[in-house]
């Protein structure tokens, strides 16, 4: 049975030819189905170190595939040392889920802007002497 999936995988930062591995992994995903949307986000920093690495090549694919193709993808990704992490979401069962690689990029920029605003907020500094005089008045 063919279902819709959103697949994200991260490749090792030291990998010389990412296109070859991306083509291999996308080929496995498209067996018995088709790739609807594919986007390479490039080399991005990790929030925390993974296997003593600080960066990785992010790739997002929206695909209609069989469960066998997804299982084969996960098996190959676990074996290949150049694949750092994978995430597979079955989006067919999630209500009101909008699948778009572009949408996920815009959501991240909004999130980063909100975090920046929160980070820059500081309470005004009041010296102890000034605070004591305000309380006495």
Swiss-Prot record:
Residues 113-137 are annotated as: Disordered. The keyword Metal-binding does not apply. InterPro entries: Ribosomal_bS6, Ribosomal_bS6_sf, Ribosomal_S6_plastid/chlpt, Transl_elong_EF1B/ribsomal_bS6. Gene3D superfamilies: 3.30.70.60. NCBIfam families: S6. Belongs to the bacterial ribosomal protein bS6 family. This is Small ribosomal subunit protein bS6. It comes from Mycoplasma capricolum subsp. capricolum (strain California kid / ATCC 27343 / NCTC 10154). The lineage of its organism: Bacteria, Bacillati, Mycoplasmatota, Mollicutes, Mycoplasmataceae.
């Amino acid at each position: 049975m063919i279902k819709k999936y959103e697949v994200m995988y991260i490749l090792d930062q030291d990998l010389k030819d990412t296109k070859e591995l991306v083509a291999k992994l996308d080929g496995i995903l498209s067996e018995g189905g088709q790739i609807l949307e594919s986007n390479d986000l490039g080399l991005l920093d990790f929030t925390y170190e993974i296997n003593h690495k600080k960066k990785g090549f992010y790739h997002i694919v929206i695909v209609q595939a069989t469960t066998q193709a997804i299982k084969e993808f996960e098996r190959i990704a676990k074996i290949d040392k150049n694949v750092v992490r994978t995430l597979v979401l079955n989006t067919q069962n999630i209500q009101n889920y909008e699948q778009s690689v572009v949408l996920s990029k815009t959501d991240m920029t909004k999130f980063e802007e909100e975090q920046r605003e929160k980070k820059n907020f500081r309470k005004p500094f009041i010296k102890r002497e000034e605070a004591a005089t305000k309380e006495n008045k």
